[in-house]
UniProtKB/Swiss-Prot annotation:
Key words of the record: Repeat, Transferase, Ubl conjugation pathway
Organism this protein belongs to: Arabidopsis thaliana
Residue intervals of the U-box domain: 71-144
Pathway this chain belongs to: Protein modification; protein ubiquitination
Protein's UniProt name: Putative U-box domain-containing protein 46
UniProt enzyme class: transferase
CDD domains: RING-Ubox_PUB (cd16664)
Gene name of the record: PUB46
Enzyme Commission number: 2.3.2.27
Alphabetical GO biological process terms: cellular response to water deprivation; protein ubiquitination
The keyword Cell wall biogenesis/degradation is assigned to this record: no
Signal peptide span: none
Spans of repeat ARM: 241-281, 283-322
Functional summary from the UniProt entry: Functions as an E3 ubiquitin ligase.
């Protein structure tokens, strides 16, 4: 009796499989009009419900010990997760996927995972039909219908990372290393889960990623593309807050980034500086970078680099100078000469003025600006500042240059600028709150100088 019942159940499952296929595929390329197609789908749905009802009755007669594991209909399985769908949704291509998986996919892609079709939009709608059929099927078959965990969703996007890293770190072919590094660069850029998994989930991952570069000598011309992709992947990984300390404390990272600041493609040098800028957001990393040869390489990049490279290097040095002891190090490395040279040439003026305003509280920095005659460049900027912030930073530098030494002969230079152009009076009226405050302070010094009184510290 049990055998006969099981045979009936198998027959019903096969019938259900055929009906499900008809429901899901109906209208996919045939010539029937919409009314006829809709009528066919409705009939198929009714038939599926009838079969499921019969199947439930049949299954209830089978002793639990005789029930063999059931095979989930492939129409109920999400092709992204390879598991039965919990919340099926339809995307623009007409395909149905598990909501949590396709939502993660659509954050980074605009193609259908199955058809590779470019989607007209990234919206999805619930597939209530399939959801109801899955629910009934699970009840009939006593199938556990659990919600997928976040870890399983993450696993979808990290399953091939270990293999890619293995190819980068141990491949005998440079071409294969480049291909794998390029894919790692792509995945670490597009998928936040990959950034988490790469550092936290793979043992010694940073060392393995950088190993091809650590074996290179000073001449890296033969592997410029490999270097660029590895450095850029490292930058992508450094964006994640929890990765910054782990990356910076790896003994290979700072030396290899320093090397990449000096040599490589323009993009490699920019991204090496961007990585250091990202890492330097953490206070402990400011110390690590400040104690390395990266400081001199960053200053050289400020002087020699293109617009974007100089911007990234300046951002890094700015972060480093938040730590007091690093100010003297960047001055010793030649920052003042490099920065003033770029400003005189009209390049990266806003970023570099912000940096010099920060470091103008350091005595040696002010002395070097004085020797280079930078005060006259500041006057020129203050007469026609490109923005409120530019004017603010320029007047802060002027204030700090003269606040430490209000010698009359020095103040005479500032007084002449005010007499000829009214520079500080304009700033006091039209500048930002901070700029106006500094300009007022300078005007008070000038007034005291004109009256012959020794300027007093505020």
């Amino acid at each position: 009796m049990a055998d006969s019942t099981e045979t009936n159940a198998d027959t019903l499952r096969r019938e259900l499989q055929k009906v499900l296929t008809e429901i899901l595929n109906d209208g996919g390329g045939n010539d029937r009009d919409e009314t006829e197609a809709f009528s066919g789908v409705v009939k198929a749905i009714d038939e599926a419900v009838r079969i499921l009802t019969c199947l439930r009755k049949v299954e209830s007669k089978i002793p639990e010990s005789d029930i063999s594991p059931v095979e989930v209909p492939k129409e109920f399985i999400c092709t992204l997760s390879n598991t039965i769908m919990i919340e099926p949704v339809i995307i623009a291509s007409g395909q149905t996927y598990e909501k949590r998986y396709i939502t993660e996919w659509l954050k980074h892609e605009r193609t259908c995972p199955k058809t590779k079709q470019v989607l007209s939009h990234r919206l999805w709608i619930p597939n209530h039909l399939i959801s109801d059929l899955i629910t009934q099927w699970c009840l009939v078959n006593k199938y556990d219908h659990q919600k997928p965990s976040d870890e399983l969703v993450a696993e979808l996007f990290t399953s091939d990372i270990e293999a890619l890293l293995q190819r980068v770190s141990s491949s005998s072919s440079v071409a294969d290393q480049i291909e794998a590094a390029k894919e790692l660069r792509h995945q670490t850029k597009k998928f936040p889960n990959v950034r988490v998994f790469f550092v936290a989930g793979i043992h010694d991952s940073i060392t393995r990623l950088l190993s091809p570069l650590s074996t290179l000598d000073e001449a890296v011309d033969s592997s410029l593309e490999l270097q660029e992709n590895i450095v850029t992947a490292l930058f992508n990984l450094s964006i994640l807050e929890s990765n910054k300390t782990v990356i910076a404390e790896n003994c290979l990272v700072i030396p290899l980034l320093t090397k990449s600041l000096k040599q490589g493609t323009d993009e490699t040098r920019r991204n090496a500086a961007a990585t250091l800028s990202s890492l330097s957001a953490i206070d402990s990393n400011k110390i690590i970078i400040g104690n390395s040869e990266a400081v001199k390489a960053l200053i050289d990049l400020i002087e020699e680099g293109d617009l974007l490279a100089t911007k990234e290097a300046t951002s890094t040095v700015f972060n480093l100078c938040i730590v007091l002891e690093n100010k003297g190090k960047v001055v010793s490395a030649g920052l003042i000469h490099a920065a003033t040279k770029k400003i005189k040439a009209g390049s990266n003026v806003d970023e570099l003025l912000s940096l010099l305003a920060l470091i103008s509280t350091h005595n040696r920095a002010v002395e070097e600006m004085d020797k280079l005659g930078f005060i006259y460049d500041l006057f020129s900027i203050l007469r026609k500042p490109s923005s409120l912030l530019t004017g603010e930073n320029a007047v802060v530098i002027v204030f700090n240059m003269y606040d430490r030494n209000r010698d009359r002969s020095r103040l005479k230079v500032v007084g002449e600028e005010e007499n000829q152009h009214g520079t500080f009076t304009k700033l006091a009226k039209q500048g930002s709150v901070r700029a106006a405050r500094k300009a007022q302070g300078i005007l008070q010094w000038i007034k005291r100088f004109v009256t012959g009184k020794e300027p007093q510290r505020a």
